[in-house]
Amino acid sequence: MTTPTLISISDVLIARVIALGDALRARGWRLATAESCTGGLLAGTCTAPVGASDWFAAGFVTYANDAKTGLLGVPDALIAKHGAVSSEVADAMARGALAHANVQLALSITGVAGPGGGSVAKPVGTVWLGLAWVHARETQEGLPAGGDAPRMGSRTERLQLDGDRAAIRAQTVAIALERLIAQAQGQASA
C-alpha cells in the first residue's frame, strides 16, 4: 500500500492568505477565483486557514474551454479569436466569476504551465491573470438607482515564468495572492 502524499502550503503563503482575508473582511468583500492552468491551487490555498468562509465565496476550475464558456460565460468566439491563454479570456473569466459568484472581487488565471503546449507567441510559462472588482461606491451604497448592475473594473497582467510545471503553478499562486492583497487594500491602480 502506498502512503498518500500530503500537500503542504508554506507559511509564507498562509501569511499572505491571512493578510488577504483581513483586507477583504475590513472592506466587507468576498472573493471568487476562476482557474485554468492552476487547477484550483489558488482556491485551495485561500481556503487553507480557518475562517476563510468569511471572505472566500467560490472557486471555479475551468480547465477546458467548454467549462470557461459554460460556467463563466466566456464567449466561444472570444476563445476562438484570441485563444484560451490571452488577456481577453482572462478578463472574461474574472468578470464571469465576479458576476456568477455575486462577489466584490475575482481573480482568474489562464496559462501554459507545460511541459508541452507552448508556442512561439505563448511559450511555456506564459500566464495571464485577470482581476475584476465592483467599484467601492456600489459596495458601500448598494446597487445604483434603477436596479442597474453595479459598475465593474478590471485589468489583466501577463506573466512570463520559468521552471517546471509545479514551479510555474506555485509562482502563479504566489503572485496572484500579492495582486489580490494589493487590490483588497486599495493599493492597486484601478
State the predicted function of each range:
Residues 1-190:
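Short alpha-helical segments enriched in small residues
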